[in-house]
Each structure stands twice: as C-alpha cells, then as structure tokens.
Amino acid sequence: MFIVAVLMLAFLIFVHELGHFIIARICGVKVEVFSIGFGKKLWFFKLFGTQFALSLIPLGGYVKLKGMDKEENEENKINQANDSYAQKSPFQKLWILFGGAFFNFLFAVLVYFFLALSGEKVLLPVIGGLEKNALEAGLLKGDRILSINHQKIASFREIREIVARSQGELILEIERNNQILEKRLTPKIVAVISESNDPNEIIKYKIIGIKPDMQKMGVVSYSVFQAFEKALSRFKEGVVLIVDSLRRLIMGSASVKELSGVIGIVGALSHANSVSMLLLFGAFLSINLGILNLLPIPALDGAQMLGVVFKNIFHIALPTPIQNALWLVGVGFLVFVMFLGLFNDITRLL
C-alpha cells in the first residue's frame, strides 16, 4: 500500500498541473514545459510543442507558460505572440492560475460522486446507546430512525448533519418491532473546549443523546441527483475543515506540531484498507492541495493571482527584482514548512 500511496500523491500533483495545462491551452497559451517534480529532468519527451518531463525532486510540479516569466518586459517579442500568457486578459490569467486548484476540487467532487453512486458503506441509523434526553423522549436501543422532520435518513451520519442545522423541536419517525412510531425531542447544546485547550475557543454543537450501533453496517445507493448532492456536501465539509485548521494554525490556537509532511501523508494514505478509503483520503488531500495553492504566499498560485489583480485592476506592479526576491522568500518559507512537517513525522515515528 505504501507504493500505492506514493503514486496517489504523485497523481494529485499531476491533476493540479493538468488543470493549469488544460486551462492554458483553452485560453490559447502555449505550454512549453509540463513537469512532475522539480530540479533535473530525469526523463522527458516532446509532444505538440510541449516538453513533458519527470524531474528529480517529486515534491510538486510545474508548467512553464510561454511569456509568463518575461511578462514584465513589454518590449520582448515573445510577449507579442497571440499564444503568449502576457497577451491574455486579466480574467484569462486568473482562470489559468486558478486552473490547478479547480482541477483538484473537481477531482474530489468526482470521487465523492462516483463512490456515492456505486454504493456507500455506512453505519445504519440504528440506536446502539442512549442518554437521558433521548430516553425521556421515548427512544430505545435498537430503534431505527427513518426520518427527522420528514427528511428520510439512510445513515447515522445524516442524523448528525440534520441535527446540526436544526431549529427547535425535532420530529423523529422510527421503526420498532415492525411498527412505525413518532417521537419528539429538542436537541441540547453542548459546549467543549477545542483540542488546542484554549478556553477562549469554545466549540458548540447540538446532540440528541443517541449513539450508533457499530455492528449495524449497510450499503446505501443514491440516485444521480442524490449522489451529486452528497458529493457537494462532502466537498463543503472538507473545505470547512481545512480552512478552519489553517485559521487555527495562523491564529496560534493550533500547534505547529500538528503539521505533517510527506512521510505523514503517505503513511496515512498507506493505512487505507480498501480502494474506497484510499480514494476518500485522496479526495480530501486533493482539496487540501487546492486550498493551500490558493494561499497568498509568493511562489504559490494565490500570490500570482493577487499580483494579476493588483496590476490590472489597481494598476500596482512591483519591480521585477522585488518580485524575484519575494518569490525566493516564498520558496524558502515553503521549504521550511516542508522540513518542519518532515521533522514532526520523524518525531512521531521515534
């Protein structure tokens, strides 16, 4: 599974660079180089004017667009060609830069969609344990929840989702001994301190006091529309989780010791015990890769998009030497974060 995990990570990088490549070609920009990895090219071939390469350091990838690295030199003849990045509109430039993250997001949604369409292994909505408020509402161990507020329930996960966004009293339709019963209860709000142990960071959530029966598993199939809805819901959950983790890291409420590097990521991927688990983790990692690339850090897509906005909308452009210096700072920062993650991975193994 370790080799499969490494290949999955390489594939996600390929998906990201493929996004830049395809959007650039749609916008009429010539792609000079498409590389998986950085540094010395180990193997390459040329096709339709593009050099496709596999490079020495497999910790990323890049596409080299015609005219992109010489965009500041307005007199350069290469910039006057119609297939040059420099000649494209601000919208096209932003679309090309966003293309990598867009393909990462698209890959994740498609994985979630096809897994839901093919049948998802889930915990059935059968009660395995109860707390006081659930008992007082008349619920019993072994009850199967059919619907909440007239919304059909197929898995225990859906119960949590509906309860989380509910308002006021809930109407539960349950099956008990082949009879359909209706029960009513109001969720209670529980407040806990986050994992950071910061007393100022309180997490509140709603519960109805039931636990699943871990032995009751089943496969739920969805229609095309339902599968698409599930895919978007899972994608949204992934985005919220990643953005919140970044926020906590930036605000200092999460420790940098929580960062993982390549070893940790590959290790987590290699623990997937089925193809569906590997794909689910790969989809989440793909969302992560897309969001991280949109951060406004020099050398990442987000900073380049910010540069396009400032130059073409606010008419503010930094001199090339300053841009190059910022790029080096950005690369240095990313290398530092990478080695910090690697250090954390090794520390966990010791």
Swiss-Prot record:
Zn(2+) binds at residues 16, 20. One of its GO terms (biological process) is proteolysis. CDD domains: cpPDZ_EcRseP-like, S2P-M50_PDZ_RseP-like. The chain crosses the membrane at residues 43-63, 94-114, 249-269, 277-297, 326-346. One of its GO terms (cellular component) is plasma membrane. Belongs to the peptidase M50B family. Its cofactor is Zn(2+). This is Putative zinc metalloprotease jhp_0242. It holds the Pfam family Peptidase_M50. Gene3D superfamilies: 2.30.42.10. GO terms for molecular function: metal ion binding; metalloendopeptidase activity. PANTHER family: MEMBRANE METALLOPROTEASE ARASP2, CHLOROPLASTIC-RELATED, REGULATOR OF SIGMA-E PROTEASE RSEP. It is found in: Cell inner membrane. PROSITE patterns: ZINC_PROTEASE. The lineage of its organism: Bacteria, Pseudomonadati, Campylobacterota, Epsilonproteobacteria, Campylobacterales. InterPro entries: PDZ_sf (IPR036034), Pept_M50_Zn (IPR004387), Peptidase_M50 (IPR008915). The active site is at 17. It is a multi-pass membrane protein. Its EC number is 3.4.24.-.
